[in-house]
Design a protein with these regions (language model features):
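Phospho-regulated, Ser/Thr/Pro-rich intrinsically disordered or coiled-coil terminal scaffolds
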Residues: 1-150, 155, 160-161, 166-170, ...
Length: 195
């Protein structure tokens, strides 16, 4: 399955509120084609050294493309940051619920244990979705840059991925990995407690 179709399928399955924050892969593909068309052929902007930023910056269509790419990147990165922070808060809420349920001095209804277990499962699922969001967007930026290089004859992908993408929080997300491990442990702890 082509990446664009795969991405559309994943977006369809994800939280609808996240829709605007995914990379707009289709739009960026169109921009590449417009960049090539505007510059008068796939190799016109690549008449100098193919990865020299000075040569690339002289081509207006290239400047527009990379400005749009950075806008997409900022949008995705900002959303990931706020979602990751929200996950930290949500984990603490589920953890606090577990501690309250363990407290024998507090009265609990018969469904409290089941609700807490369901909350833990929902939280885990949401963190997995956020990890998937990070991975799919990273792949999207990589693919769009490879496509750009193929169509324009430039060699910008590797440099952009190393110098720009690697600085973004969603490209390496240790906090998400830690949250997944913590929630797995919490789930086991909840399952193991006396009802």
């Amino acid at each position: 399955m082509k990446y664009g179709k795969n991405l559309a399928h994943v977006i369809e399955l994800s939280d609808p509120e996240w829709g605007p924050y995914w990379i707009n892969y289709k739009f960026m593909k169109k921009r590449i084609k417009e960049t090539v068309k505007t510059s008068g052929g796939s190799k016109t902007c690549a008449h100098g050294i193919r990865s020299d930023p000075k040569v690339i910056s002289k081509c207006a269509a290239e400047r527009v493309f990379f400005r749009l790419l950075r806008t997409e990147l900022k949008k995705t990165s900002d959303f990931f940051t706020s979602s990751e922070q929200l996950c930290q808060i949500r984990y603490q809420c589920v953890r606090d619920g577990f501690l309250i349920l363990q407290d024998t001095t507090v009265l609990h209804d018969d469904n409290a244990w089941t609700r807490l277990l369901m909350a833990c499962v929902k939280f885990y699922k949401d963190v997995l979705l956020l990890e998937n969001f990070a991975i799919m967007n990273y792949c999207g930026f990589s693919k769009i840059l490879k496509k750009h290089d193929k169509w324009t004859g430039l060699t910008t992908c590797e440099s952009f991925m190393i110098n720009v993408m690697s600085q973004e929080n969603f490209t390496h997300h240790p906090n998400i990995i830690i949250l997944l491990a913590k929630s797995e442990k919490l789930f086991s702890d909840i399952q193991g407690m006396e009802r």
